[in-house]
Every structure is written in C-alpha cells, then in structure tokens.
Amino acid sequence: MTKKKAHKPGSATIALNKRARHEYFIEEEFEAGLALQGWEVKSLRAGKANISDSYVLLRDGEAFLFGANITPMAVASTHVVCDPTRTRKLLLNQRELDSLYGRVNREGYTVVALSLYWKNAWCKVKIGVAKGKKQHDKRSDIKEREWQVDKARIMKNSHR
C-alpha cells in the first residue's frame, strides 16, 4: 500500500478586505456560511474572489452579501450563465440575525465583509458590525502604525 502524502495546507484565507479595517471601527465579528453555486466553489478554490467592495444587506429576516466578485473559470461554467457579482445569501442562525438587526438599526452602523476563508470543506465569510471612521481617525491609525515600526527599529538597533 502506498502512503498518502502529508497534506501541507496553505493559507485557508481566500480573500481579505483590508479596506474595511481602514475605513471602519469593527465592533463585533460574526462567522457566516455562504449559499454558493458549483462554479463559485470551483472559482473560490482557485482563489478568484474579491470582497473589497462588498457589504451585507439585511432584508426580510435574512442577510445577503452584495458586491462580492467571484470570477468564473472558463472550464467550470460552460453550460451555466454566471453572474460574478450576484447577491449571495448568508447562512446565520436566528440569534445572530437578531443581533445584527438590532445593531444596524442604530445610527451609523453597517455590516461589512472582512474575510472569506475555508473552514474544513465549507466556505465561510467573516462579517463585522462597523461604524465609519472620520478622516482624523484614519490619520491617527497611520501615525500609530508608523510609531510601532519606528519603535521596533529603535529596539532592534539598540542591542548592537
């Protein structure tokens, strides 16, 4: 009998929304499943996804992911009409949906997609309840990040 090769998993992350953390204060995060079609799963396995402009819309007691772009592969979708930016239903339990509805109905809160990743064989999306940042908040975050880099450089050079 032949031995199976040890599986060296790469990163389980498919796509990140770095812009969301720059433009919003993320207050709470949820993990949601996605209702996908077959060609979308194959494209996600190939890493052809972009969620930088995506957001979550709550409607009729359900949550939907808008603006996520999953590029179809030519070989995977020959007989199906593919819509790369179609609305995809998020799979959340009722308690999580109620929490999201309560938060979003407050002034200034929105729900954004933070990352798209694999969990076992299932595709999951991490969504966050967020409040928009002002321009001065973004600048202070950049200053803080630069200070952390400078501090690390100073500490590294001080030991020589």
UniProtKB/Swiss-Prot annotation:
Q: List the PROSITE patterns hit by this protein, alphabetically.
A: SSRP
> Is Nucleotide-binding set as a keyword in this record?
no
Q: Where in the cell is it found?
A: Cytoplasm
Note the InterPro entries from the entry.
SmpB, SsrA-bd_prot, SsrA-bd_prot_CS
Sorted UniProt keywords = Cytoplasm, RNA-binding
Instruction: Identify the Pfam families for this entry.
Output: SmpB
Keyword tRNA-binding listed? The answer is no
Taken from the UniProt entry, a GO cellular component term is: cytosol
* Biological processes annotated in GO: trans-translation
One annotated GO molecular function: RNA binding
Q: Which NCBIfam families match?
A: PRK05422.1, smpB
Functional description taken from the UniProt entry: Required for rescue of stalled ribosomes mediated by trans-translation. Binds to transfer-messenger RNA (tmRNA), required for stable association of tmRNA with ribosomes. tmRNA and SmpB together mimic tRNA shape, replacing the anticodon stem-loop with SmpB. tmRNA is encoded by the ssrA gene; the 2 termini fold to resemble tRNA(Ala) and it encodes a 'tag peptide', a short internal open reading frame. During trans-translation Ala-aminoacylated tmRNA acts like a tRNA, entering the A-site of stalled ribosomes, displacing the stalled mRNA.
Query: PANTHER family given for it?
Result: SSRA-BINDING PROTEIN (PTHR30308:SF2), TMRNA-BINDING COMPONENT OF TRANS-TRANSLATION TAGGING COMPLEX (PTHR30308)
For this chain, the family text in UniProt reads: Belongs to the SmpB family.
Q: What name goes with this protein?
A: SsrA-binding protein
Species assigned in the record: Escherichia coli O6:K15:H31 (strain 536 / UPEC)
Q: What is the lineage of its organism?
A: Bacteria, Pseudomonadati, Pseudomonadota, Gammaproteobacteria, Enterobacterales
Gene responsible for this protein? smpB
